[in-house]
């Protein structure tokens, strides 16, 4: 019986070069990032002492914590809802297979700008513009999330099956009808999934933007940290973790229902 030997696949020079570039970037970034793993191990005792100050959590003001957590959720709800509404037209206008280049290129750059700036930066700007409070947080999440969802929606639109759209076009439908009956039904499950995920992310982001005065539990958390009230800080962190975990569970069930 003749033995057939299969030669191993040859590594392309491009693949080897790519790995070399990745390794070089990691090496160069080591110094810039001031990586110090040995210091982390050396100061482990101090970190353990610091961590012990967080226990037991102080839930004595739990009613105030729940009130601020509710405000944080409301900030995330409105920031996400407004972004979902606006991301649909912007996402469609960012899709290369729906509109000409002179439409999608400017819209993409606008969405890049919304996405490139962190929510914290937007929150600081809106705190100056509209004052302290939850509304500044809503606007910050709204702008950033619009950029993210528009990007995700445009990629989903560009990956749709052209058959249904062509079939609707063959009936004499106009462009709007093609989008309503051929495009949106294909991407709507993904849009719902992306929106639920961004809502989870926005709850966490709403906590952070609160630290710069944009309302919610972030304000209380920052005051506890700044006042070295670590047991209260731990209680607030536990509440945030439990809330995000519950939202993750609920959104997972909803995603299974829609997809």
Curated annotation (Swiss-Prot):
Source organism, top-level taxon: Bacteria
Molecular-function GO terms, alphabetical: ABC-type phosphonate transporter activity
Function: Part of the binding-protein-dependent transport system for phosphonates; probably responsible for the translocation of the substrate across the membrane.
Membrane topology label: Multi-pass membrane protein
UniProt keyword terms in alphabetical order: Cell inner membrane, Cell membrane, Membrane, Transmembrane, Transmembrane helix, Transport
UniProt gene name: phnE
InterPro entries in UniProt: MetI-like, MetI-like_sf, PhnE/PtxC
Protein's name according to its UniProt entry: Phosphonate transport system permease protein PhnE
ABC transmembrane type-1 domain mapped to chain residues: 69-251
Membrane-crossing residue ranges in chain numbering: 13-33, 75-95, 123-143, 176-196, 205-225, 230-250
Complexes and interactors: The complex is composed of two ATP-binding proteins (PhnC), two transmembrane proteins (PhnE) and a solute-binding protein (PhnD).
Localization terms from the record: Cell inner membrane
Native organism: Escherichia coli (strain B / BL21-DE3)
One GO CC term, this protein: plasma membrane
NCBIfam families: PhnE (TIGR01097)
Family: Belongs to the binding-protein-dependent transport system permease family.
């Amino acid at each position: 019986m003749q033995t057939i030997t299969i030669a191993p696949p040859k590594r392309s020079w491009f693949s080897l070069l790519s790995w070399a570039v990745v390794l070089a970037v990691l090496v160069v970034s080591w110094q810039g990032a001031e990586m110090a793993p040995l210091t982390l191990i050396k100061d482990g005792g101090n970190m353990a002492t610091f961590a012990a100050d967080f226990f037991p959590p102080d839930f004595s003001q739990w009613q105030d914590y729940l009130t601020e957590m509710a405000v944080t959720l409301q900030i995330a709800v409105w920031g996400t809802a407004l972004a979902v509404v606006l991301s649909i037209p912007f996402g469609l206008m960012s899709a290369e297979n729906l509109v000409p280049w002179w439409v999608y290129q400017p819209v993409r750059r606008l969405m890049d700008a919304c996405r490139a700036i962190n929510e914290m930066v937007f929150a600081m700007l809106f705190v100056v513009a509209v004052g302290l409070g939850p509304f500044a947080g809503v606007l910050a999440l709204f702008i950033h999330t619009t950029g993210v969802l528009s990007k995700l929606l445009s990629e989903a639109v560009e990956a749709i099956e052209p058959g249904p759209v062509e079939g609707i076009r063959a009936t004499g439908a106009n462009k709007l009808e093609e989008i309503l009956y051929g495009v949106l039904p294909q991407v709507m499950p993904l849009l719902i999934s992306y929106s639920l995920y961004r809502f989870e992310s926005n709850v966490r982001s709403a906590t952070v933007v609160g630290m710069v005065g944009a309302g919610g539990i972030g304000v209380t958390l920052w005051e506890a940290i700044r006042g070295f009230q670590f047991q209260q800080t731990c209680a607030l962190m536990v509440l945030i973790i439990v809330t995000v975990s519950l939202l993750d569970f609920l959104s997972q069930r909803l995603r299974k229902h829609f997809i």
